Amino acid sequence: MSEDTYKTIAVPSEGIYTEKRSKFIAIALPVRTVEEVKAHLETYQKKYYDARHVCYAYMLGHERKDFRANDNGEPSGTAGKPILGQINSNELTDILIIVVRYFGGIKLGTSGLIVAYKAAAAEAIAAATVIEKTVDETVTFLFEYRFMNDVMRVVKEEEPEIQEQSYDM
């Protein structure tokens, strides 16, 4: 993977992990903004209103600098961090992974929770279609007509996606 590409998922996916009767449902979603993350969290918190915990982690941007992990009441570092760890291990971005926990009556302990949240997130990623995208930028060129041949030569060599052309005489 080069600097001008990044990995993400194409469509939502799901994974399920069960440990000592506790059920962990992981949902991986492609996202582009924090607003999308918040909207998905609201939707899934309502959908799984009866779950004990709805934990998550996300990573945004091709530079992978915008991220967050949330334990949602689980002991600190036992849910969000392992989920984020799976995102990092797979070098993914523009992704939100939500893991919903239904408590099965048997406590898992700190290490058990870490393993379970990590495994659930890994299941959702394994079920996902991972794609490589290019980092796109919009560039506008304004030039005099006499430079047309030079500009078109560069366009032919570099093969950019041309979104619009206009000629003002």
Where are each of the predicted segments found?
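Non-DNA-binding regulatory cores of transcription-related proteins
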Residues: 164-169
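Structural motif
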Residues: 27, 54-56, 94-98, 138
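Short glycine-/aliphatic-rich beta-strand segments at the starts of folded cytosolic domains
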Residues: 130-147
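Hydrophobic side chains in well-ordered alpha-helices
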Residues: 37-40, 117, 150-154
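C-terminal regulatory domains involved in ligand/effector binding and gene-expression control
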Residues: 1-77
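A common structural junction motif
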Residues: 48-51, 158-163
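Active-site beta-strand/loop microenvironment that shapes enzyme catalytic pockets
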Residues: 79-126
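Short amphipathic alpha-helix segments
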Residues: 142-161
